[in-house]
């Protein structure tokens, strides 16, 4: 009897061992099978891979992308708040008189367009391009805004800034606060007219991407957008001063040379090169484009050729199907293809003391 029980226990132990062995082998085989299948959700992807995949889905559009002279450029869908195209669009660059877009909208929001502005010696002494404001004389805010936006007069920009901000430093603070408010964290302005400048914090700069967002705000999202568009769409403006009649002409050629441009601002300094920012509209689709470092003297028309290329691309079928991810904001050109690199937005700048 004892011998029988021992044999019985041995058989049970053997059966248990075999069962455990079979289960273990089955689990191992199952795991390897899952590994081979690479089931969704089991793979690890870096954020860089995710950015590459976003671009990869549009590589077939690369041959249709505009060929530009600009060092930095961007094309922005103002409704979706996404970038359709970008080249070095988060690089900090001098941006010349495109600064006046923000100068104009801050002035419209903070002051009355019918204010009377007394001209300081500082404003009167600004370099060309200038209206020739006379220190001590008074002008209407509206006339100064038209002079700044149509003819890009530097003295008008300073007079507006001092009136609205109390000083150019005070106005720069208002500009940088507005830039931060609308998400333009790559922008830092020192002068209201965009002339090159530096201080202890940084140099006067923006990015192609930020300038698109600034234009989008000015043209469509500010409570003063209607007034802004009225000013920037005016082809010729005339008013009377003590010095006689003044006539301003709009230098935004795209208003008459394309069917879609509704606003724009040019710019140039030796450091910035030729610059241009515009708002375009077709069939209710609202977009902005920006160009920085778009040639230097003897290549003044590069910006118009580039702008037209971007406008044509913006209203084409290719652009309607394109998408540049928020992470895809800095680009490198390699042959006929475009590689987008990951960009991380900086933290909001402390501008309380600037």
Language model region names:
Residues 36-209, 219-221:
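Active-site-adjacent loops and short helices of periplasmic peptidoglycan-processing enzymes
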Residues 86-88, 291, 353:
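Short clusters of small/polar residues that mark proteolytic maturation junctions
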Residues 343-354:
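Single conserved hydrophobic/aromatic residue that forms the stacking wall/gate
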């Amino acid at each position: 009897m004892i011998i029988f029980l021992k044999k019985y226990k041995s058989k049970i132990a053997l059966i248990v061992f075999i069962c455990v062995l079979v289960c273990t082998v089955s689990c191992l085989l199952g795991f390897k099978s899952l590994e081979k299948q690479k089931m969704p959700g089991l793979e690890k992807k870096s954020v860089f891979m995710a950015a590459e995949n976003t671009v990869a889905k549009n590589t077939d559009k690369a041959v249709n992308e505009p060929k530009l002279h600009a060092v930095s450029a961007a094309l922005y869908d103002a409704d979706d708040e996404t970038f359709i195209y970008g080249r070095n669009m988060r690089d900090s660059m001098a941006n010349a008189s495109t600064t006046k877009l923000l100068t104009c909208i801050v002035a419209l929001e903070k002051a009355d367009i019918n204010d009377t502005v007394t001209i300081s010696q500082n404003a009167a002494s600004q370099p060309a391009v200038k209206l020739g404001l006379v220190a001590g004389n008074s002008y209407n805010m509206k006339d100064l805004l038209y002079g700044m936006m149509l003819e890009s007069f530097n003295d008008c920009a300073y007079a507006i800034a001092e009136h609205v901000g109390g000083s150019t430093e005070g106005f720069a603070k208002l500009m940088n606060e507005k830039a931060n408010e609308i998400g333009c964290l790559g922008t830092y302005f020192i002068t209201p007219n965009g002339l090159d400048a530096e201080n202890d914090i940084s140099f006067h700069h923006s990015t192609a991407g930020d300038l698109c967002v600034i234009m989008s705000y000015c043209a469509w999202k500010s409570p003063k957008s209607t007034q802004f568009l009225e000013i920037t769409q005016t082809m010729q403006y005339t008013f009377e001063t003590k010095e006689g009649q003044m006539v301003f002409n709009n230098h935004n050629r795209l208003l008459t040379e394309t069917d879609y441009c509704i606003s724009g601002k040019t710019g140039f300094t030796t450091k910035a090169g030729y610059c241009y920012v515009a708002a375009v509209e077709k069939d209710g689709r609202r977009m902005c484009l920006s160009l920085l470092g778009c040639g230097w003297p003897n290549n003044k028309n590069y910006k118009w050729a580039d702008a037209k290329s971007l406008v044509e691309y913006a209203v084409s079928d290719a652009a309607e199907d394109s998408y540049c991810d928020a992470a895809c904001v800095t680009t490198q050109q390699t042959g006929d293809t475009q590689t987008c690199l990951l960009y991380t937005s900086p933290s909001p700048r402390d501008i309380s003391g600037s």
